[in-house]
Amino acid sequence: MTGRRVHERYDCDIPLHVQREGEEEFTGEVVNISLGGIYCLTDVTIPYGTEVKLRFRVPALKEDAIVAATVRWAKPDGVGFQFGSLRAIEVWALNQFFKNLTPTPPLD
């Protein structure tokens, strides 16, 4: 890992459901994931700093993970979300999931 990233990222392709308070849920496609957050493809514009709830499937969990997150950056085709607090079971399940994924190459 290089740069400012604290957590290793992993390439994946899973659906992501995003809920902003008082607005309709929308979906995106996760490009990569780490213990720190998610980058997803979507055509929905979300301003920096927006707080959301993310819902996504992690194979080791019986139910979808529902995680509070904050928009840290946005591009025309996608959004980077930083997770709030993850529960211990979610950290464990994500680490199990990562064992089957390919690490995302570091940014140069």
Specify the residue positions occupied by each region the protein language model found.
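Structured alpha-helical
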Residues: M1-D108
